[in-house]
């Protein structure tokens, strides 16, 4: 019965999303009101990751609470339904809960908040999560508060990738404490995030087993290069897959696609497997049209992986001026042509991959009606 129910739900999702599939791979005009925000609340970070060099560079100060308050007084943010708080390491901001309060007040349709953390300082993370949960308890529109914890290897491997001795054990402690909290708070959900890279491509199965033992879902994403968000495009030879490593990574992503029951992640994994072997991405995501990024200094970007061009700064212009301006539209067109085809990021894949699933499901249905309908290879 559960399998029948699951297939029925997927079929309904396919049918519904097929009506909006054409929006994904072309310019959307007029530009819609966004529903997804990634807010990098600080550039500061307490890890020393080999695949992210953000911690190596001096940055300007973070936005103050007062500046964030002024920014979100703009009612053009009222369409937002999903928020991700990231960094740097977002829990390093002592006023994180104040920022969350400002945003939830300004966004009455917000139903999911995600906190992306490295999990290094267990007690700090737990206290921040508790504070955030208290803040949203009175906000009935928020259905889920997701804590996404990074884990890239077992034991010393994770320590080496993240550049801090004992990092792995602290992450496990953080996950264990969060799991205890989740038993008491239904709106708290947990997720492990892992970046597949040359150093850990042979450790994916171990990570899956660890996550299974913890009872926490894990998602894998391919390593992404960004000149601004990760600042990892220079001197990154060790981060590039050698041909034999790329072949193994492609096999890993193919296996993940076969094993994962979630349609949205399944199609990302298949795309990632092809990209490891040199193909371009088959499906773009919704960033720049339905989602956007606010950086710690107020700069607005269409995507964290296309940060060499900014829409502008919210301390100087209103969101309406930035979002619907000619400058932003030119950047969107450039992003679709230059960045999206080679972007292997798992971030922001839910809407676009459901749309791809919808397209495939819809064509499968057509093939049943018309056997001459061309079979889709994916």
Predicted regions and their residues:
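Radical SAM enzyme [4Fe-4S]-AdoMet core and its adjacent flexible, acidic
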Residues: 2, 6-7, 140-297, 301, ...
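Conserved alpha-helical substructure of the radical SAM core
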Residues: 3-145, 227, 354-356, 364, ...
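Short, charged low-complexity linear segments at domain edges
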Residues: 13-34, 266, 270-274, 310-327
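Soluble, non-transmembrane catalytic domains of enzymes that act on hydrophobic metabolites at membranes
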Residues: 36-60, 67, 75-78, 82-86, ...
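Cys/His/Pro-rich metal-binding microdomains
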Residues: 46, 50-53, 286, 341-344
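Residue-level signal for well-ordered alpha-helical positions
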Residues: 52-55, 128, 161-164, 306, ...
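Short, flexible loop/turn elements at secondary-structure junctions
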Residues: 89, 117-119, 151-153, 194-196, ...
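Flexible mid-to-C-terminal extensions adjoining Fe-S/redox cofactors in radical SAM and related proteins
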Residues: 297-378
């Amino acid at each position: 019965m559960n399998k029948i129910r699951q297939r029925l739900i997927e079929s309904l999702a396919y049918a519904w999303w097929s009506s909006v599939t054409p929006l994904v791979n072309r310019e959307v005009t007029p530009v819609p009101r966004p529903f997804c925000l990634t807010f990098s609340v600080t550039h500061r970070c307490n890890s020393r990751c080999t695949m992210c060099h953000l911690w190596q560079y001096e940055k300007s100060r973070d936005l103050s609470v007062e500046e964030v308050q002024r920014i979100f007084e703009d009612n053009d943010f009222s369409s937002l339904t999903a928020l991700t708080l990231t960094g740097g390491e977002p829990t390093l901001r002592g006023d994180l809960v104040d920022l969350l309060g400002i945003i939830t007040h300004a966004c009455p349709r917000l139903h999911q908040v995600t906190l992306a953390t490295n999990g290094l300082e267990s007690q700090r993370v737990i206290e921040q999560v508790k504070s955030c949960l208290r803040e949203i308890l009175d906000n009935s529109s928020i259905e889920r508060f997701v804590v996404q914890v990074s884990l890239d290897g077992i034991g010393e491997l994770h320590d080496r990738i993240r550049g801090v001795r004992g990092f792995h054990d602290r992450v496990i402690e953080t996950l264990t404490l969060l799991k205890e909290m989740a038993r008491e708070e239904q709106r708290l959900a947990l997720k492990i995030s892992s970046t597949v890279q040359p150093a850990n491509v042979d450790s994916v199965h171990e990570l899956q087993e660890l996550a299974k033992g913890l009872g926490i879902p894990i998602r894998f994403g391919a390593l992404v290069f960004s000149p601004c968000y990760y600042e990892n495009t220079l001197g990154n030879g060790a981060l590039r897959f050698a041909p034999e490593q790329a072949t193994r990574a492609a096999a890993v992503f193919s296996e993940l696609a076969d094993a994962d029951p979630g349609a949205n992640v399944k199609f990302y994994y298949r795309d990632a497997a092809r990209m490891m072997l040199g193909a371009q991405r088959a499906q773009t995501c919704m960033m720049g049209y339905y989602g956007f990024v606010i950086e710690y200094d107020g700069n607005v970007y269409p995507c964290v992986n296309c940060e060499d061009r900014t829409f502008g700064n919210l301390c100087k212009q209103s969101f309406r001026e930035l979002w619907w301006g000619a400058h932003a539209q030119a950047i969107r067109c450039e992003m679709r042509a230059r960045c999206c085809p080679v972007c292997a990021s798992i971030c922001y894949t839910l809407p676009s991959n459901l749309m791809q699933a919808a397209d495939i499901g819809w064509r499968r249905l057509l093939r049943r009606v018309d056997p001459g309908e061309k079979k889709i290879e994916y």
